[in-house]
Amino acid sequence: MKSHHQSHSSTSSKAHDSASCSQSQGGFSQPQGTPSQLHELSQYQGSSSSSTGTVPSSSQSSHSSSGTLSSLETVSTQELCSIPEDQEPEEPGPAPWARLWALQDGFSNLDCVNDNYWFGRDKSCEYCFDGPLLRRTDKYRTYSKKHFRIFREMGPKNCYIVYIEDHSGNGTFVNTELIGKGKRCPLSNNSEIALSLCRNKVFVFFDLTVDDQSVYPKELRDEYIMSKTLGSGACGEVKMAFERKTCQKVAIKIISKRRFALGSSREADTAPSVETEIEILKKLNHPCIIKIKDVFDAEDYYIVLELMEGGELFDRVVGNKRLKEATCKLYFYQMLVAVQYLHENGIIHRDLKPENVLLSSQEEDCLIKITDFGQSKILGETSLMRTLCGTPTYLAPEVLVSNGTAGYSRAVDCWSLGVILFICLSGYPPFSEHKTQVSLKDQITSGKYNFIPEVWTDVSEEALDLVKKLLVVDPKARLTTEEALNHPWLQDEYMKKKFQDLLVQEKNSVTLPVAPAQTSSQKRPLELEVEGMPSTKRLSVCGAVL
């Protein structure tokens, strides 16, 4: 979106596409509203009375403060001088990421280009309250030298988060709510900013990078401020949001009922199946599994999830080419503990892959959480499932051999875990469609993974042994999660203590599996309590978590 108003302080005869009212450019302008600006401002509801006199009429805006238009009217027609060949054309400035519309006389519009802006009476502020018209108002003395600041920080998925921070004595208000001195809150599109008094509305904030909040259900908007898009999938998208009461960041998955229903032969069955899966997943309680916080059933489904700011394991591996073995061990141990918990509660994930493993922070040592239960199945009485689903590269041989027609069990998740561990340790996949001489299906069903000796020279024999015992074609001979947790590579007390310390930091706790004293075939259940977890109900649904 472009801005067309010009600065009163400008002496140039050139018109500018973007606003020149930024103080970083030296001085502010009173808004010289063009018809497009007036239309843009008219989209904001409820500001017409408070903005009276702020934006001039279209007739007023037809004159330039520098006299450019009147000069052009008197210049005789002549050929324009050509630009010398050695002269570089001027490069356009950076596009604004937000715009503040002034609602009162004495205040000016601001296009935000920089990442940080201070507002106040102090001349060091990027937006200084020093205009003569503003000084004559009765509220001028109620404004602090440094009243508030607006800034943005990089969040997950390289998306910026915009905040407003109160530093005033008399208060800064967003949508009539006091922020509080020294406190911050996220600033969403169309927010009203008032100074000193909640009714003294001075600005409307327009985030030029996000959609309008009004497209979301009112009950959702009452509790959450929607922000940037984090990702998208076949059935919807995931957005970052903020809980209004606490300013806590969350992720909200939006499942399109229409798109979801199109994939079902019986649309009437769609809503009950999604709701059933949501209810089951809400009962899962494990520090290494994404937790559903809330659900809104409106025109679409809105599922509120905890936000993992470290991004996907896939991106972490790609960014580092490969992971250190110690880091792999910490992450993989958590994956095993989480999947073991799922299996003991009668759930098979069926789509485990690095994209579905999320990291709690950008730190190398961090918690992981399993997500995307879109392909998950609740085991029935036979403990076998059918249907072909999941990502081909990570599918177990028994799934591909049967084309989804024969039954298969929780061993499919253990195969996928083996593929993930292989990728983390080596930085490349064991099976790939790029091997043109052998099809992906044949590679997997024969168990012939791509082993590059020079890549594995610095990987321990114990780690490689665990990979080999997970990537076994026969599901009956493949290690279970229990057996994998008892593997010598994972008998690392230092790693386990690090995991426990991370849990303490996150205010979580879990009883770790203990290796049996005699044999590795003994079963020791993970001591986690889940109330009301169904264990015999079948469910087929397209996923509640991206």
UniProtKB/Swiss-Prot annotation:
- Enzyme Commission no: 2.7.11.1
Q: Supply one GO BP term.
A: mitotic spindle assembly
SMART domains on file:
FHA, S_TKc
Q: Which domain of life is it from?
A: Eukaryota
| SUPFAM superfamilies on file | Protein kinase-like (PK-like), SMAD/FHA domain
From the UniProt entry, list the residue stretches annotated as the region Disordered: 1-70
Q: Where does ATP bind?
A: 231-238, 253, 306-312, 355-356, 372
Record PTM text: Phosphorylated. Phosphorylated at Ser-82 by PLK3 in response to DNA damage, promoting phosphorylation at Thr-77 by ATM and the G2/M transition checkpoint. Phosphorylation at Thr-77 induces homodimerization. Autophosphorylates at Thr-387 and Thr-391 in the T-loop/activation segment upon dimerization to become fully active. DNA damage-induced autophosphorylation at Ser-383 induces CUL1-mediated ubiquitination and regulates the pro-apoptotic function. Phosphorylation at Ser-460 also regulates ubiquitination. Phosphorylated by PLK4.
List required co-factors: Mg(2+)
Tissue expression summary: Ubiquitously expressed with higher levels in the thymus, spleen and colon (at protein level).
Q: Which reaction does it catalyse?
A: L-seryl-[protein] + ATP = O-phospho-L-seryl-[protein] + ADP + H(+); L-threonyl-[protein] + ATP = O-phospho-L-threonyl-[protein] + ADP + H(+)
Q: Which residues form the FHA domain?
A: 117-179
**GO cellular component, as recorded:** chromosome, telomeric region; Golgi apparatus; PML body
| Residues recorded as bearing Phosphoserine in the entry | S71, S82, S383, S460
Q: Where is the composition biased (Low complexity)?
A: 8-70
Q: Which residues carry this modification: Phosphothreonine?
A: T68, T77, T387, T391
Q: Which family does it belong to?
A: Belongs to the protein kinase superfamily. CAMK Ser/Thr protein kinase family. CHK2 subfamily.
Please give the name of this protein. Answer: Serine/threonine-protein kinase Chk2
Organism expressing this protein natively: Mus musculus
Specify the taxonomic lineage: Eukaryota, Metazoa, Chordata, Craniata, Vertebrata
